[in-house]
Amino acid sequence: MQKSPLVKASVISKLFFSWTRPILKKGYRKRLEVSDIYQVPSADSADNLSEELEREWDRELASKKNPKLINALRRCFLWRFIFYGILLYLGEVTKAVQPLLLGRIIASYDPDNKEERSIAIYLAIGLCLLFIVRTLLLHPAIFGLQHIGMQMRIAMFSLIYKKTLKLSSRVLDKISIGQLVSLLSNNLNKFDEGLALAHFVWIAPLQVTLLMGLLWDLLQASAFCGLAVLIVLALFQAWLGKMMMKYRDQRAGKINERLVITSEMIENIQSVKAYCWEEAMEKMIENLRQTELKLTRKAAYMRYFNSAAFFFSGFFVVFLSVLPYAFLQGIILRKIFTTISFCIVLRMAITRQFPGAVQTWYDSLGAINKIQDFLQKQEYKTLEYNLTTTEVVMENVTAFWEEQGFGELLEKAKLNNNNRKISNGDNKLFFSNFSLLGSPVLKDINFKIEKGQLLAVAGSTGAGKTSLLMMILGELEPSEGKIKHSGRVSFCSQFSWIMPGTIKENIIFGVSYDEYRYRSVIKACQLEEDISKFAEKDNIVLGEGGITLSGGQRARISLARAVYKDADLYLLDSPFGYLDVLTEKQIFESCVCKLMANKTRILVTSKMEHLKKADKILILHEGSSYFYGTFSELQNLRPDFSSKLMGYDSFDQFSAERRNSILTETLRRFSLEGDPSVSFNETKKQSFKQTGEFGEKRKNSILNSINSIRKFSIVPKTPLQISGIEEDSDDPVERRLSLVPDSEQSDGLLLRSNVIHTGPTFQGSRRQSVLNLITHSVNQGQSFRRTTTAPSRKMSLAPQASLTEMDIYSRRLSQDSSLEINEEINEEDLKECFFDDVENIPTVTTWNTYLRYITVHKSLILVLIWCLIIFLAEVAASLVVLWLLKNNTPQQEMNSTQSGNRSYPVIITNTSFYYIFYIYVGVADTLLALGLFRGLPLVHTLITVSKILHHKMLRSVLQAPMSTLNALKAGGILNRFSKDIAILDDLLPLTIFDFIQLLLIVIGAIAVVSVLQPYIFLATVPVIAAFIMLRAYFLHTSQQLKQLESEGRSPIFTHLVTSLKGLWTLRAFGRQPYFETLFHKALNLHTANWFLYLSTLRWFQMRIEMIFVIFFIAVTFISILTTGEGQGSVGIILTLAMNIMSTLQWAVNSSIDVDSLMRSVSRVFKFIDMPEEGAPVKSIKPSRDDQLSKVMIIENQHVKKDDIWPSGGQMIVKDLTAKYVDGGIAILENISFSISPGQRVGLLGRTGSGKSTLLSAFLRLLNTEGEIQIDGVSWDSTPLQQWRKAFGVIPQKVFIFSGTFRKNLDPFGQWSDQEIWKVADEVGLRSVIEQFPGKLDFVLVDGGYVLSHGHKQLMCLARSVLSKAKILLLDEPSAHLDPITYQIIRRTIKQAFADCTVILCEHRIEAMLECQRFLVIEENKVRQYDSIQKLLSEKSLFRQAISSSDRLKLFPHRNSSKHKSRSQITALKEETEEEVQETRL
């Protein structure tokens, strides 16, 4: 970044904002980059501002029992705020003085007032000077107030972030992500521009008092008639505003419903295409869109009338002020035109400035109170450690999480349940396990490990393993007992947290660099091969949570970070969840057992190999110590521990009834037990009321950016970013984000891809806490890159789940004193980590975009023509009256009084021509502004255009190839459907209407003035030319600065979410100072762009006003010097010239707003123009009597129409090559093999070898070459969707969209309830569905969070059974399953797909043993394709991975022992990253 010219700018340069000329010139000539932006002045840097405010806030906390944040702000900013307020007041006072001088100028043309004619020129000079003074006062004052607002926002941004890093985990569980993001977006954004209006809360009343005094002097009591009209108008506008909010509130729920479904569609677009659900999703979203648009139109009409009422009110105010006085006493022209000028100022003060100021204070004080409450929340406590201690000891440790009483929770749950539309017939479903809430997470834990020992912690789901580690870290505070260790701790979370930066920075993490240690860690964690594949090696920048890495790569980087730190105690929480068997084995031996052999280690695991090599084993069960000792002691004392804890061995021996009972209990335990708020309907915010049954089931919220996993319901989510965020300020437990934009300002729409987009979160019954985000895991198999995007709540932050054992903890770990923190931050790395891709659209909206927008709907052209006809008719009528006026010079009749008294022209008889003219012009302007015959059709048609564009964009996204979608960020896609569609619905129609109406008013006024005085037209031409050139010059730069500012906003929210996700790691490593510095860096980048945008905008506004001042000076002197005795002409010319000044500037701003908003149209068109992957084949809806398989009939020249395809499931793959993008690197090369009908094939290979990619290639989701045949039919001769229907899919990332069970199983409505129940019974879902009220009509929300991951897998299995697919693709189906559901799936696949071809990608050896053949993929190619016997007889990956015990299972005849073995200790299921263990949900 360059040094800002502001530092050395002169006073004159600062006054006229001339220091911004270099950036304006550069932006006009070329596209601006971040490097072109000026550095933030030191006075605006986040470090300095936050330090000052933090110092004053600490002072406030120390000195008072009830500290007030506003007092700290007052001490920091008050005097400058007062100074700029005085300047603003002086500038506004000039508006009241101008009409007085105008009246004197008109009076000087009185034929009997010759003595004043000589001073008319001086009065004109004085009037012009007032305009100059106002310009020099108002612009610095407005900019100064905006600058103060910006500084206040920056300081509070930083204060909130620092506080967030200090909050106890217990508090974090009670604060929603929505509340945090709202504090940093909605609330604080009000300060930047709103502060400029704050002073009008006292300026406007003073101004009204002054103006009414002057009007009293002119019209006596009649002046109050005009005031009464303005008050009535203000009340009418308030009523319209209330009605508008009513419709917007009703619409908010519908918008969120649509955005939730859209977000789920985008997040799971690969699954949507695999299931061929494009048509179903399109219909579902369009139905919601129709209901939303009805309310959108009503809200738009209310706002339209509000806007129109302001314009036409001017005539009535003047008319009702003057008319009584004229009837009673007669009136002179001077008083008429002076009254007009006074009323213009009065109307602005009463209807715009004062209400705006009151709203600003209301919003600002509310935001300050929210921030004040947040800053006073409980912080985590620093634990005391003994640095000389070498052992780790726990003595009689017990810990609780929940502080809230059980009775209160139960009452809330019952109340929520009673409020549901579908009654719950079995309340036990929601309340059966609430008694566990009062139970401790850990009970009476005792153990002692010496230096250098390895403690393996095992246990079932929810046993308390992670809680144990959190206790050692200090995040969970023990209620009894004591913990003893040195405090020098390193921690590896099971959540594979990756911070923005390079691989090397992620591993070193601020610790001093040691080359030998670094290389040793890389080697031990098996990262050498992965790093060597990157061109930048370990300096490759990982953005957005490392989403471009595989799950295994992220897990190994997280482990390497923990191992690299030199600590006394290493806490490793299930670090091997996403590693293949071979890699896991190598890392455990080389890293855990060798590299860290002399260190104390606590490893959470359930693998038998790990338990055997541990020095001590601690097995937890329901929070208690089930066993503590060595492995040999475990074999002797607890030989049945595996079946005791997991229910694994005995499951197949249970009866069908017993299995159903176990499955039902699994649903309760895994889905509902831990979260007391599972069935709570939190209080809905008044402004976001839901309508309809579907809306009753959820929160009005969608967080476009981060999904976390539900406790026990283990489903990986990919973060999206969203725009627009609302929050309930009254209820601290409220979990709500909203994408509903503030229709009053385009900047109010934040998405935040970047929010940070994120996935959807319904306003449902589950708690959306920050802790959910900490326990969130990014989907490991997703190929998208997710983010949140900026300009309007781009940020997509949405935790989608709770956790289990990651309870809420309230203590901090002391910072490691040995850390050498490196605070250097590379700006390019920061940009690469955080920024969105630069939009490939022109810096200024092209005429082609306008033309294309106008021609979307043919009615729009007709409406615009109709508007033009009305305008021409009004102008023609005005010109006719002017012609009559010019050709019928009135003879003025005088009201003569006694001699010595002066006479004044009174409005009677012929003189009333002027008065009649003014009435006519007022009526014409009223029709022009109100536009009843023009405005309503225009607004209505523009909303229809928005509807058409949304439909086209939705269809385009659904039909776009995955290669195109993979190149886009999901947050960016969601922003098109949220922020941009909101702009097309709300802002663009009314902004276009305002611009057209203002432009026509200005053109009409110029026409009138030019007819009265043709010389003025000569002055108008250069003014218009200057305006057009200046606008074009400014737009090139301003739009680029706005885009850079929008991109710069994303890092702020992304960094907040990143920090929260890794908060436990941050605290364990003591990296809070580094992340505060990183946050300030991101904040300064945004400030640099925003400050420069405000400065250039003020430069432009000032230049526009200077041009208008010159124009007014020219008009004034031309009219004075060329007009004869006509008072009327001078009055009309000067009054309209003053009106032109204000209206034209408003029109200029509107034109800039239109151009800015039209960029959303450009982005939508860009999505509409995406390529299509193939014409969709309409789904065939069979009759109820048809067999299920009849749906697979295809129209193809190779198959007879009476035949059914596929019939056997034979697959022949020839030279298959796959690429993510066309022309990219091949990720699979020359794959060839064949599969016989009904054969089971297992895919083998290391993490990232391409197993999941091969399954995607089968579905034609990638760019592929080669050929695949199914039962002799080639994919080249088969329609794309029909080809995909041949496959049944159980993906690694399960897709449950928001809707009923029936809709999720049968989105097209093809099957009867009887058929659905039959399939549900086959896959073991019947007992699950029957537990819910409404059964098949129960509405699932938030990705089906009330279901465990296993039940979601069963849903996918049921879909495949319903489709009667002959080929089943399974991608890690058991990755996140409890053993019970895993057995159900294994049994169902054996039975339901006994005659089908099955292709399985799996990490569990026992599942792979059932396959007849194995395809070994290595380095993107097929290395082996053979039977299991052949692979075991050769040296292969499979032989290295399989254990001797598994070989005995395969070949039992090789075991000479004939006796029946007793209960064996079998491998406990390894709990993966998503299997968050928690005893409280």
UniProtKB/Swiss-Prot annotation:
Keywords: ATP-binding, Cell membrane, Chloride, Chloride channel, Endoplasmic reticulum, Endosome, Glycoprotein, Ion channel, Ion transport, Isomerase, Isopeptide bond, Lipoprotein, Membrane, Nucleotide-binding, Nucleus, Palmitate, Phosphoprotein, Repeat, Transmembrane, Transmembrane helix, Transport, Ubl conjugation
Residues spanned by motif PDZ-binding: 1479-1481
All copies of domain ABC transmembrane type-1, residue ranges: 81-365, 860-1156
Residues holding ATP 2: Y1220, G1245, R1246, T1247, G1248, S1249, G1250, K1251, S1252
Record GO terms (molecular function): ABC-type transporter activity; ATP binding; ATP hydrolysis activity; bicarbonate transmembrane transporter activity; chloride channel activity; chloride channel inhibitor activity; chloride transmembrane transporter activity; intracellularly ATP-gated chloride channel activity
Positions of modified residues (Phosphoserine): S550, S661, S671, S687, S701, S713, S738, S769, S796, S814, S1445, S1457
Residues with a covalently attached lipid (S-palmitoyl cysteine): C525, C1396
Record topology, Extracellular segments: 99-122, 217-222, 320-339, 881-919, 1013-1014, 1118-1131
Residue ranges, compositional bias (Acidic residues): 1471-1481
PTM section of the record: N-glycosylated.
Entries under InterPro entries matching the protein: AAA+_ATPase, ABC1_TM_dom, ABC1_TM_sf, ABC_transporter-like_ATP-bd, ABC_transporter-like_CS, ABC_transporter_C-like, CFTR/ABCC7, CFTR1_ATP-bd_dom1
CDD domains: ABC_6TM_CFTR_D1, ABC_6TM_CFTR_D2, ABCC_CFTR1, ABCC_CFTR2
Catalyzed chemical reaction(s): ATP + H2O + closed Cl(-) channel = ADP + phosphate + open Cl(-) channel; chloride(in) = chloride(out); hydrogencarbonate(in) = hydrogencarbonate(out); ATP + H2O = ADP + phosphate + H(+)
Cross-link (Glycyl lysine isopeptide (Lys-Gly) (interchain with G-Cter in ubiquitin)) at residue(s): K689
Transmembrane feature ranges: 78-98, 123-146, 196-216, 223-243, 299-319, 340-358, 860-880, 920-940, 992-1012, 1015-1035, 1097-1117, 1132-1152
Protein purpose: Epithelial ion channel that plays an important role in the regulation of epithelial ion and water transport and fluid homeostasis. Mediates the transport of chloride ions across the cell membrane. Possesses an intrinsic ATPase activity and utilizes ATP to gate its channel; the passive flow of anions through the channel is gated by cycles of ATP binding and hydrolysis by the ATP-binding domains. The ion channel is also permeable to HCO(3)(-); selectivity depends on the extracellular chloride concentration.
Record-given protein name: Cystic fibrosis transmembrane conductance regulator
Organism listed in the record: Cavia porcellus
